[in-house]
Amino acid sequence: MLPSQSPAIFTVSRLNQTVRLLLEHEMGQVWISGEISNFTQPASGHWYFTLKDDTAQVRCAMFRNSNRRVTFRPQHGQQVLVRANITLYEPRGDYQIIVESMQPAGEGLLQQKYEQLKAKLQAEGLFDLQYKKPLPSPAHCVGVITSKTGAALHDILHVLKRRDPSLPVIIYPTAVQGDDAPGQIVRAIELANQRNECDVLIVGRGGGSLEDLWSFNDERVAQAIFASRIPVVSAVGHETDVTIADFVADLRAPTPSAAAEVVSRNQQELLRQVQSTRQRLEMAMDYYLANRTRRFTQIHHRLQQQHPQLRLARQQTMLERLQKRMSFALENQLKRAGQQQQRLTQRLNQQNPQPKIHRAQTRIQQLEYRLAETLRAQLSATRERFGNAVTHLEAVSPLSTLARGYSVTTATDGKVLKKVKQVKAGEMLTTRLEDGWVESEVKNIQPIKKSRKKVH
């Protein structure tokens, strides 16, 4: 009988799939060292082999797109270091690893240490560009930290002598290979900084295997290069060799000879540049002098043309011509003026105003007499008309009537009273007499009855 809660039941396919997923996701990519056995390479180009140690073994596969990057031919019994993904071949339930990269065991371990140290120093910021110091341009003294018997020193000195023989070089001899090499390299860098004799350092050696170059993958050397106040150029091995020192240094040169070229000036090239510059300066000077000479000649010619004596002579000649022209013009002007005066005198004599003035005076006297007579006659007639008008006006003037004892009475509204019905008792009246006005109040009104005429 089954229990009340049945356990999960896997099919074989599901079991293998679950195990494969667990292996791939939980384990991920790992490094494995071991001995190769049962190595085969079918026509497909893939590699199939077993990786084992003294007590266990595991099947491995390395596909063609991965094994083409391996630089050696794996041999039976060879110790190797592989980077692989763990998986399960589901159809048969075979546990195996898929190899991505392979190295001989010795170099593989070193490469693993290299990658770990590189990641650590990069995380600490030793590779950051902000810490890179610029190289002096030009360098006044070069320090070389390398083996005093190695080919690297010979190459560096040869290039420096060829390019810049006058450049001082200070050698700090040190071992570049072996257990003591990292410590000696560190002390040489510190000594160069203490003495402060150089303004740039070349740290390097010639080519070799990964083990030969391992001193320059040492963390102590990397820290010393980073702490150096003097700019450091790394020159380790060949162009394909890349060490930790290359990442930390202020500049990486592919070879020691290239490092020497970087820190030195090419005196032959400088000499050619100086000669070229000298030729350009000479040509420019010749052109400048020729131009100045031509300009000087022009100015000198102009000065000769503008000499004071020449100018004075020209002005004197011009003055004489002007004097002659002025004298001739003055004589002609006086001659024309005399002729004009004679003509005007003749015209004046012909147009003598005395007879006209006499006739005009006689005419004026006649007109004055006639004007006086006319004015007297008009004045007499006007006086007569004025007298008649005054007499007529006096005859019809109200003042004359008032003078005979009559008066004119007006109401308060200014109207002349003609009948008693125009006023009422109590009203004020104004009366105009010959010599003034009289104001009076109406006390009583008595109209006069008119008698009717009998008609026969």
Swiss-Prot record:
Give compartment(s): Cytoplasm
CDD domains membership: ExoVII_LU_OBF
Protein name per Swiss-Prot or TrEMBL: Exodeoxyribonuclease 7 large subunit
Does the record carry Membrane as a key word? no
Q: Which NCBIfam families match?
A: xseA
Keyword list (alphabetical) reads: Cytoplasm, Exonuclease, Hydrolase, Nuclease
The GO terms this record gives for MF are: exodeoxyribonuclease VII activity; nucleic acid binding
**Which GO terms are recorded in the biological process aspect for this UniProt protein?**
DNA catabolic process
Recorded source organism is: Shigella dysenteriae serotype 1 (strain Sd197)
